[in-house]
Amino acid sequence: MSQQKPHINLVVIGHVDHGKSTLVGHLLYRLGFVDEKTIKMLEEEAKKKGKESFKYAWLLDRLKEERERGVTIDLTFVKFETKKYYFTIIDAPGHRDFVKNMITGASQADAAILVVSARRGEFEAGMSAEGQTREHLILAKTMGIDQLIVAVNKMDATEPPYSKQRYEQIVAFLKKFMKSLGYKVDQIPFIPVSAWTGENLIERSPNMPWYNGPTLVEALDTYIQPPKKPVDKPLRIPIQNVYSIPGVGTVPVGRVETGVLKVGDKVVFMPPGVVGEVRSIEMHHQPLQQAEPGDNIGFNVRGISKKDIRRGDVAGHVDKPPTVAEEFTARIFVIWHPSAITVGYTPVIHAHTASIAARITEIQAKLDPRTGQVIEKNPQFLKAGDAAIVKFKPIKPMVIEKYSEFPQLGRFAMRDMGKTIGIGIVVDVKPAKVEIRAKK
């Protein structure tokens, strides 16, 4: 993998069974990141189980299992290259925890591929009130992902196959919805593909002569820009995992969101307030002297044991530590709730890699979702479709920052009853007092 090309974190989103895993698997295979032997083996295995059409999806699951078995400092991500960029696909999608992962994963993504099925009934299911196409688009927008490519998948399964009319119907419907969320739809390519046959992934499909836009890989190189690196901001690394590696020591793993981490730095982990010294940094098994925003790293710290820190903690420099919130004020949008949200309601807040319950202590104002203007002060309750300014008190210590200062740590989703209740951005934080304690 060349480290010379700009690096982009990509998330693949969309409704269950619309072909996300097949698309990623086929792409990896066609770009040469999986060998023929593995594909043949998977084909045999899939045939035996009568699941021939799942071979590329299986490929992804296989890669995932292999990776999960070997304990590596590396983050468990799938990588591939195009002519222009070096991509990491974060969280190759599964079913259950996907929205939860989408919330934590998307906050680290620079761009997204939305996969929608063109098959009759499937597209409609994804756009229904319970549909994940709709939910993932809303989440991606809140999580700050403006760079999007839409793959209109299963074009071989439309009626008739490769139907231009069906493609245009889907594009028109999606454009209208995405526009309402604030996406710049004229800057988003909609590519008719078949993840199963590989059409329009890399080469143009002869079956869709009516389409003259880019293939999926061309679109990745043309429409996506590498993120600008916020190197001048204070260091923030939300922790995803912590390993204790024999002969090495404690190794936290996470993505640098802002600032720069160097070997030899003293870092503090909040909320616990423990301090350690950085002995080494590694990315994709390569040692680094320093890590910058966008780098997914493992770093060995002296003076801290595995039990001192956990997923959801945030590392920063001792002189400008991450903010632990006593309470915070946020602008929220309610996506779904069976009845009404009142003061005292306690959803789980998913921000960066943390998930912590927080109680609503005050509903200050209801807003017009389109303009952000106050339409009612101190409303009694909020329901689906409402936007509001709300004050939260986390049940236990949690790092969260103002969106204006650290967008990556200032966005969140509210979850309850296995669903995303709402999304929000932090407008103000009342910091808690935390003692920073260096171990002798």
From Swiss-Prot:
<keyword id="KW-0378">Hydrolase</keyword>
<feature type="region of interest" description="G1">
    <location>
        <begin position="14"/>
        <end position="21"/>
    </location>
</feature>
<feature type="binding site">
    <location>
        <position position="21"/>
    </location>
    <ligand>
        <name>Mg(2+)</name>
    </ligand>
</feature>
<dbReference type="InterPro" id="IPR031157">
    <property type="entry name" value="G_TR_CS"/>
</dbReference>
<dbReference type="GO" id="GO:0005737">
    <property type="term" value="C:cytoplasm"/>
</dbReference>
<dbReference type="InterPro" id="IPR054696">
    <property type="entry name" value="GTP-eEF1A_C"/>
</dbReference>
<dbReference type="Pfam" id="PF00009">
    <property type="entry name" value="GTP_EFTU"/>
</dbReference>
<keyword id="KW-0963">Cytoplasm</keyword>
<feature type="region of interest" description="G3">
    <location>
        <begin position="91"/>
        <end position="94"/>
    </location>
</feature>
<dbReference type="InterPro" id="IPR004161">
    <property type="entry name" value="EFTu-like_2"/>
</dbReference>
<keyword id="KW-0251">Elongation factor</keyword>
<dbReference type="InterPro" id="IPR027417">
    <property type="entry name" value="P-loop_NTPase"/>
</dbReference>
<keyword id="KW-0460">Magnesium</keyword>
<dbReference type="Pfam" id="PF03144">
    <property type="entry name" value="GTP_EFTU_D2"/>
</dbReference>
<dbReference type="InterPro" id="IPR004539">
    <property type="entry name" value="Transl_elong_EF1A_euk/arc"/>
</dbReference>
<dbReference type="GO" id="GO:0003924">
    <property type="term" value="F:GTPase activity"/>
</dbReference>
<comment type="similarity">
    <text>Belongs to the TRAFAC class translation factor GTPase superfamily. Classic translation factor GTPase family. EF-Tu/EF-1A subfamily.</text>
</comment>
<feature type="binding site">
    <location>
        <begin position="91"/>
        <end position="95"/>
    </location>
    <ligand>
        <name>GTP</name>
    </ligand>
</feature>
<feature type="region of interest" description="G2">
    <location>
        <begin position="70"/>
        <end position="74"/>
    </location>
</feature>
<dbReference type="InterPro" id="IPR009000">
    <property type="entry name" value="Transl_B-barrel_sf"/>
</dbReference>
<dbReference type="InterPro" id="IPR005225">
    <property type="entry name" value="Small_GTP-bd"/>
</dbReference>
<dbReference type="InterPro" id="IPR050100">
    <property type="entry name" value="TRAFAC_GTPase_members"/>
</dbReference>
<dbReference type="GO" id="GO:0003746">
    <property type="term" value="F:translation elongation factor activity"/>
</dbReference>
<keyword id="KW-0648">Protein biosynthesis</keyword>
<dbReference type="Pfam" id="PF22594">
    <property type="entry name" value="GTP-eEF1A_C"/>
</dbReference>
<keyword id="KW-0547">Nucleotide-binding</keyword>
<keyword id="KW-0342">GTP-binding</keyword>
<feature type="region of interest" description="G5">
    <location>
        <begin position="194"/>
        <end position="196"/>
    </location>
</feature>
<feature type="domain" description="tr-type G">
    <location>
        <begin position="5"/>
        <end position="228"/>
    </location>
</feature>
<keyword id="KW-0479">Metal-binding</keyword>
<feature type="binding site">
    <location>
        <begin position="153"/>
        <end position="156"/>
    </location>
    <ligand>
        <name>GTP</name>
    </ligand>
</feature>
<feature type="binding site">
    <location>
        <begin position="14"/>
        <end position="21"/>
    </location>
    <ligand>
        <name>GTP</name>
    </ligand>
</feature>
<dbReference type="InterPro" id="IPR000795">
    <property type="entry name" value="T_Tr_GTP-bd_dom"/>
</dbReference>
<feature type="region of interest" description="G4">
    <location>
        <begin position="153"/>
        <end position="156"/>
    </location>
</feature>
<protein>
    <recommendedName>
        <fullName>Elongation factor 1-alpha</fullName>
        <ecNumber>3.6.5.3</ecNumber>
    </recommendedName>
</protein>
<comment type="function">
    <text>GTP hydrolase that promotes the GTP-dependent binding of aminoacyl-tRNA to the A-site of ribosomes during protein biosynthesis.</text>
</comment>
<dbReference type="InterPro" id="IPR009001">
    <property type="entry name" value="Transl_elong_EF1A/Init_IF2_C"/>
</dbReference>
<dbReference type="GO" id="GO:0005525">
    <property type="term" value="F:GTP binding"/>
</dbReference>
